[in-house]
Swiss-Prot record:
Gene3D superfamilies found in the cross-reference section: 1.20.5.300
Disordered as annotated region, ranges: 28-115, 129-149
Family: Belongs to the rubulavirus/avulavirus P protein family.
Biased composition (Polar residues): 82-97, 105-115, 136-147
Biased composition (Low complexity): 59-71
Full protein name: Phosphoprotein
Amino acid composition bias (Basic and acidic residues), ranges on this chain: 45-55
Keyword set, alphabetical order: Phosphoprotein, Viral RNA replication
Protein role: Essential component of the RNA polymerase and the nascent chain assembly complex. Also required during RNA synthesis.
Pfam families per the UniProt record, alphabetical: Paramyx_P_V_C
Amino acid sequence: MSFEISVEEIDELIETGNLNIDYALKELGATSQPPPNRPLSQISKTEENNDETRTSKNSASAEAPAHASSPLRSHNEESEPGKQSSDGFSMISNRPQTGMLLMGSDTQSPSPSKTYQGLILDAKKRALNEPRRNQKTTNEHGNTNDTWIFKRGGNIATKKEAWVTQNQRSKIQSSFQDIEESTRFHGSMEEPQYQSGAIHVAHQSNQLPPSKNVHVEDVPKFANYALEILDAIKALEVRLDRIEGKVDKIMLTQNTIQQTKNDTQQIKGSLATIEGLITTMKIMDPGVPSKVSLRSLNKGPEQVPIIVTGTGDVSKFVDQDNTITLDPLARPILSGTKQITDERRAGVRIDALKITVSEMIRDLFGDCDKSRKLLESINMATTEQDINSIKTNALRSIT
């Protein structure tokens, strides 16, 4: 992997250093505001005229920014967060870095000019004329490439730069190790000296990220009410369990519903059959002829012959009043026989009728005063007519 510093990046570094110098000189009161928008010709003339008139005050002022460069670097880096080089790698970091600066060969730093533009020209010339060392590094695939690596951070009090290889950097024993930006760091077995603090020793991953950009929309939002969300989810789970139980019960009753439908269809078929049979029946009302006019009904009774079959001679059934007594089946009987039969069975019929009417009254009225009075009157009745009259009065009182 090769890190080459372009001219634009050098300009940015020089401009950052000049801003730090201006700030330090302004704090020391050893400089004045440079005239804005001076042409390049005037800058060169001013630089030539001031070569012989530099004082020790300016020399001391030029050394002062080296001690105050750490806070100024952070200030300038924060003021320029969006600057990046064309190849996606910027030497200006947007965050503070800690580490040790490995020193190379000392370069003679010229005394600063009195003007702002003069300092810029001196720094550009010094950066362009300084020779670069080509060194060999080995990447993660085992291939050897000629490249140079620039190490930033650490003690910035001295104005020195270092070009070191990957193997030399891995052998350094330091209490402060940065993450080496996008290069590999093989790790350190040394325990951190500070157990607490903002930055500890961090081991870099062996996998190089394809890009340094981060999609902001992929970052999850902060959950202010995580407990309430969990409670809501648990409540939904309970409701879902209840719904599933009810659905299971409904599925179990599905067979019963289908069986009920089949029974209903059978009942409908049977009812249709019964209705068809009823239409074929003719209900006859005895004593009421079907085709008789009103005139024929209003006629007086006529003498008609009566044929009695199966009994033989009926003269023995004729009583003294010249009448014949018939039983419920219209059979002629002796009048004395009927009376004897009625007297023998009258008590059994009355007792059965009393029991029937008493149970009916208890079901209708329950245990109340009216029910007791009706039961007493039934017990005191001796004939069927009395019991029937009590029954009729009880039914009328309900309606």
